[in-house]
Amino acid sequence: MAAKEIRFSDDARQRMMKGVNTLANAVKATLGPRGRNAVLDKSFGAPTVTKDGVSVAKEIELEDKFENMGAQMLKEVSSQTSDIAGDGTTTATVLAQAILREGMKAVAAGMNPMDLKRGIDKGVSAATKYLADELSKPCETDTSIAQVGSISANSDESVGRIIADAMQKVGKEGVITVEEGSGLENELDVVEGMQFDRGYLSPYFINNQQSMKAELEDAFILLHDKKISNIRDLLPLLENVAKANKPLLIISEDIEGEALATLVVNSIRGIVKVAAVKAPGFGDRRKAMLQDIAVLTGGTVISEEVGLSLEKATLDDLGQAKKVDVSKEETTIVGGAGRHDDIMARVEQIRAQIEESTSEYDKEKLQERVAKLAGGVAVIKVGATSEIEMKEKKARVEDALHATRAAVEEGIVPGGGTALLRAQASLDGLEYANHDQEVGINIVRRAMEEPLRQIVYNAGGDGAVVVNEVRNGEGNYGYNAQSGEYGDLVEMGILDPTKVTRTALQNAASVAALMITTEVMVADLPKDDDAGAGGGMGDMGGMGGMGGMGGMM
């Protein structure tokens, strides 16, 4: 086992603090509407330009082991905040640095770190409660949704508007994804109804030559979880569908040989207008998705597991939809005939699975299923003039989307660092057990001014002057760093999601308090390779040079 280097008390904390400051100073330059960009070198391709705090933090590794430990712990603050709220990573970093800086001073002055931590925890708990109960307002109108999106995308109003449009079209539950577009402008592509990535099994099912799709109006939908290879199983049902004079979409594990050929012939001759596709997904997920389609269309999955067979299936077992489009690669079902209550019950059931799931991949797939049942899918295609700009813009749009979802979930507070300044009121009159805990509470009070100070500093102003001016106002009164004016921030459209502000404060305090209570740090001793090589060759006299050459090869 390699020898270790051990640092104690003040020496350890100072080294850790140096690493924290290095990372925080790099990240906080990006805060606010007038924050600057960071350029990140990549091992291949063009450098990345970003104004996203967590992207900057993730790139930073320091040479000194002890400084690096501090930087890595601070990095955890921004990545945790990003994972939970999707935004607010720079704010969280600024808060953590401020709590740590003030905390280190208190520890150096001889105060008990554990009592400081208890005081910090009390202060944060009171402040987050105040944010949620007193300051937060619901975010329901399209205007406020657009404003939150704009602020998070660095005051880009077009991004805010397109996110608000997407939410309006697919509902708050719908899935909104962000992709790289091919044009210069941002575009919104909305798919209504249920869409899955399986196309027709034979091009002979196409009935619209222009769009190259099989289009079925007012169609029956047969759902089967096994392969269909024998047409005799299907004949009774096909005859009934032909009598009803409606088209039919068959979704099954597969259709092969004679069965597929017979369906194609019937379709070409116009006896039954039919299209067939494979069921989406694999294994258990396939069964679940077939069940989703059944609920959406008011049909039943014909499955031997529940004692149903194809030859005994009737028209009552079939689902119905107003319109079905089947292209080469995907199928869209619009206007399913399922009962609204059944669909909502199914959605709740899937939501319960999301809560229990531990895998991010599973959660994403379950969330997609909710969207397909409850709303639809919207794709925001980001436009830009160059690849570097495209990457930067796409990251901003994704941030804005996360922030908007957070706002819809927990509401909004006035932005620009004002909400945290107002939440200082919650720290007045808090009970504490001793003087050290009181200092802990005051550390939180001082730190809550820091995001506003930093926003003003990045805009070229004097933080202390602005903080005093905003503190003398009340409610939504704050500072607009973009225009340099004071006023009602909600009216100006400067809003932050409550969840983002709350998460930033909680995560910052959690990690900063851990660092304050650190007394010892242990790291591997740096390996001195050169000294080792030189020492080994010392006895070889004239051959030393050769030995050195050997080492070089």
Swiss-Prot record:
Keywords, comma-separated and alphabetical: ATP-binding, Chaperone, Cytoplasm, Isomerase, Nucleotide-binding
Gene Ontology biological process terms from the UniProt entry: protein refolding
Catalytic function, reaction form: ATP + H2O + a folded polypeptide = ADP + phosphate + an unfolded polypeptide
Major location (coarse): cytoplasm
SUPFAM superfamilies on file: GroEL apical domain-like, GroEL equatorial domain-like, GroEL-intermediate domain like
Pfam families listed in its UniProt record: Cpn60_TCP1
Keyword Isomerase appears in the UniProt entry: yes
Gene Ontology CC annotation, any one: cytoplasm
Enzyme Commission code: 5.6.1.7
Cellular compartment(s): Cytoplasm
MF terms in GO: ATP binding; ATP-dependent protein folding chaperone; isomerase activity; unfolded protein binding
Positions annotated to bind ATP: T30, L31, G32, P33, K51, D87, G88, T89, T90, T91, G416, D496
Gene3D superfamilies referenced in this protein's UniProt entry, alphabetically: GroEL, GroEL-like equatorial domain, TCP-1-like chaperonin intermediate domain
CDD domains linked: GroEL (cd03344)
Similarity section: Belongs to the chaperonin (HSP60) family.
HAMAP family noted in UniProt: CH60
Description of how the protein assembles with itself and partners: Forms a cylinder of 14 subunits composed of two heptameric rings stacked back-to-back. Interacts with the co-chaperonin GroES.
Function (record text): Together with its co-chaperonin GroES, plays an essential role in assisting protein folding. The GroEL-GroES system forms a nano-cage that allows encapsulation of the non-native substrate proteins and provides a physical environment optimized to promote and accelerate protein folding.
Protein name from the UniProt record: Chaperonin GroEL
Gene that encodes the chain: groEL
